[in-house]
Amino acid sequence: MVYVDSWEEFVERSVQLFRGDPNATRYVMKYRHCEGKLVLKVTDDRECLKFKTDQAQDAKKMEKLNNIFFALMTRGPDVDISEVSGKEQAEQQQAKKGRGRRQ
């Protein structure tokens, strides 16, 4: 088990781990209310990466990581994750729907 200190390093190594073996990689979130800590874990049973935080601002980062993993799982491990963003892109796409006149 390796606790990664930097968020960017955790995301990069997690994506590499998933791309190495997509069928065996798991992603787990665990929140301990009594300690106020959130632990994110990515493992493929050979290597285990963990990131621990107690900052509320990291929730947005966690949402972006979820979107990255969803893209990797649905579109395949070869997808370009630089085009994956958070909630903003989804809201922009929904805002475009329904504009204009019905015919």
From Swiss-Prot:
Q: Where is this region: Disordered?
A: 81-103
A Gene Ontology BP annotation from the UniProt entry: SRP-dependent cotranslational protein targeting to membrane
Enumerate the subcellular locations listed in this protein's record, separating them with semicolons: Cytoplasm
Q: Which Gene Ontology terms cover its molecular function?
A: 7S RNA binding
Swiss-Prot/TrEMBL keywords: Cytoplasm, Ribonucleoprotein, RNA-binding, Signal recognition particle
Q: What InterPro entries does UniProt report for this protein, alphabetically?
A: Signal_recog_particle_SRP9/14 (IPR009018), SRP9 (IPR008832), SRP9-like (IPR039914), SRP9_dom (IPR039432)
A cellular-component GO term for this protein:
signal recognition particle, endoplasmic reticulum targeting
Q: Which family does it belong to?
A: Belongs to the SRP9 family.
Its quaternary organisation is: Heterodimer with SRP14; binds RNA as heterodimer. Component of a signal recognition particle complex that consists of a 7SL RNA molecule and six protein subunits: SRP72, SRP68, SRP54, SRP19, SRP14 and SRP9.
Q: What does this protein do?
A: Component of the signal recognition particle (SRP) complex, a ribonucleoprotein complex that mediates the cotranslational targeting of secretory and membrane proteins to the endoplasmic reticulum (ER). SRP9 together with SRP14 and the Alu portion of the SRP RNA, constitutes the elongation arrest domain of SRP. The complex of SRP9 and SRP14 is required for SRP RNA binding.
Name of this chain's protein: Signal recognition particle 9 kDa protein
> The organism's lineage?
Eukaryota, Viridiplantae, Streptophyta, Embryophyta, Tracheophyta
Its gene name is: SRP9
